[in-house]
Amino acid sequence: FHVDKPETPGYKIELPEDGAKQIVEKKSDTVEEVDIASLLAMGDLAHGEKVFKKCSACHVVDKGGENKIGPALYGVLGRKVAAIESYKYSSAMAAYDKEWTFEEMNGYLKKPQSHIKGTKMAFAGLRKEKDRASVILYLNQNSDSPLPLP
């Protein structure tokens, strides 16, 4: 049995000349802003604790918990981004001069690398809105002073 090696590896996909443009336009048409109150209403604390197990390889959420690969997240909502002095953040994260609001956390959890370009967090993100909403509620609960929900 013998198979000749192709000149160029891969598959050729034929598109109409304006096909790529149509695909890009269609994708951008579906982008919509999420109302954070509606998003958080989808959340569930028990589900958030379960989903957070993906995060627990690198983060702790216990009061007084030590930094791991990532910073400790107890009381993260409402505090300044990159605020834990004992953790060495990426320069991108350290320069990101914002506070962890519900909206900021939602954007970051959705796609960390896109939300803060240059972050060293390698996690791809949480695609499902319910997962993000639940983790945000779980993080907010793990605080001495949880933020009031919108």
Language-model regions, residue ranges each:
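N-terminal targeting signals for export/organelle localization
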Residues: 1-22
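Gly/Gly-Pro-rich "capping" loops immediately C-terminal to redox-active cysteine motifs
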Residues: 49, 63-102, 122-126
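The canonical Cys-X-X-Cys-His
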Residues: 48, 52-61, 135-139
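C-terminal capping alpha-helices of c-type cytochrome domains
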Residues: 1-2, 99-150
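N-terminal post-signal-peptidase region of extra-cytosolic proteins
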Residues: 36-41, 56-60, 88-89
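Electrostatic cytochrome c docking/interface patches
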Residues: 20-52
